[in-house]
Amino acid sequence: MPSHAKTRMVALVGPLTGERRAVQTANHPMNPDDMLPVPDIVLLVAEDDASAMVFRYTAHGEFGGDTLHASVDEAREETEAEYDDALLAWEDVPDEVRDAHAFAVRYAYERLKNRDEY
């Protein structure tokens, strides 16, 4: 059985109320039509506290980008600053889950699939 990362957390991203904050490393400034999709969920993964990755996905599995951070705390702080009040509470990915990326997409889909009905 493969070992799991020490830290695996997800947080849903609600509707953005302000201007979208994005940092592009190439072709800046980028045409908004060419930007990656706005995510419905973020996944934070870290093997140790030396570095952490944040991955962004839509509820339909579209990749919305990723960022490398120096630590879990920095990843959380920068992600919370990026999405402000739109970022909901962080929740741990259950230990028994093997694929945290698939879990994140499924988690978002199950919680957001009926949002247009409200």
Residue ranges and their predicted role:
Residues 1-35, 115:
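Negatively charged, low-complexity tracts enriched in Asp/Glu with abundant Ser/Thr
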